[in-house]
Regions:
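N-terminal low-structure segments adjacent to metalloprotease catalytic domains
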Residues: 1-3, 246
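A short glycine-rich, aromatic-capped structural motif
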Residues: 2, 11-13, 17-105
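Histidine (H) residue identity feature
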Residues: 58, 74, 83, 108, ...
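Charged, often glycine-rich, active-site loop that binds/positions anionic groups
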Residues: 100-118
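C-terminal, surface-exposed recognition/capping segments
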Residues: 112-268
Length: 268
């Protein structure tokens, strides 16, 4: 833990090429269209460009059925400005946990779009390739988590790390609805790395990897204790990974966000 700035993404040329190949070879039997998925989905255009993510519960964290866009938008915005842009559209950002569930859905389950139609394997593979494959250009996305330290003695030593999430905009300020103390998470950067399968299978309710992690090729940057750290995931020719020590004011042309919507049309 330190106050020095660390990149959102890895910088060393260690690949995930074999992992990506395995993901793209995933086979599934394709069921018929599920018309129930599109019920109530009336607040956006082009539902065929969204993926249905069923609601889930993970310990104290739960969320409702939602639709995740296949593509990132709002490239070049920092974390706070991305939240503001999403709020103005009635959309929201994926939390780390939702991002984990999104990847698990793409890898292991039958995927439906917002109309209830099955998304073909080649399209699912292209989405996974865009998220995970180690190659240029740089592709990254913000995730809805910022980290704050509370209860420091004399504002210098000790303290507890909290993750704030489910952000909305209150009087023009990005404000979290939920905050959880971080316990049992992997402390310390792994460059590389952690095992992708292990992380996705055994992620904590927060979405962070457990302290009982397996070694692998996926880069991981722990949350900084500087009260200025946010989360994101990305890949480029130097590697791919989860960064929780990113600077909330950081920007890049390849860094965007998924403008998610609740299935019932609600907003945060």
């Amino acid at each position: 833990m330190n106050n020095s700035y660390r990149p959102l993404l890895p910088v060393n040329p260690k690949g995930l090429d074999d992992v990506a190949d395995a993901l793209l070879k995933n086979d599934s039997n394709i069921p018929p269209q599920d018309d129930s998925l599109s019920s109530g989905f009336t607040n956006i255009q082009s539902p065929e460009k969204y993926i249905f993510l069923p609601g889930k519960s993970h310990g104290s964290f739960s969320y409702s059925d939602m639709f995740v866009p296949m593509d990132r938008t709002h490239q070049g915005k920092n974390w706070s400005d991305a939240h503001l842009a999403l709020y103005q559209e009635g959309a929201f950002m994926l939390t780390i946990r939702q991002f984990v569930d999104f990847l698990n859905l793409l890898r292991h389950d039958i995927v439906h779009d917002g109309n209830g139609r099955v998304v073909n394997k080649s399209k699912v593979g292209a989405i996974l390739d865009d998220i995970l494959t180690v190659r240029d250009p740089y592709r990254a996305e913000w995730l809805d988590a910022d980290f704050k330290v509370k209860d420091k003695k004399l504002k210098v030593v000790g303290g507890k790390l909290y993750m704030n999430y489910e952000h909305t905009i209150v009087k023009g300020v990005v404000t979290s609805k939920r905050s959880e103390e971080m316990q049992g998470y992997l402390a310390g950067d792994k460059t590389p790395g952690i095992d992708l399968d292990d992380w996705l299978k055994n992620a904590l309710p927060s979405g962070l990897p457990s302290a009982n992690f397996k070694d692998g090729k996926l880069y991981y940057y722990e949350p900084d204790w500087d009260n200025n750290s946010v989360a994101g995931f990305g890949a480029y020719s130097g590697g791919a990974g989860l960064g929780c020590g990113g600077n909330l004011s950081g920007t890049s042309g390849g860094l965007g966000v998924r403008a998610c919507r609740e299935k019932n049309g609600g907003t945060r």
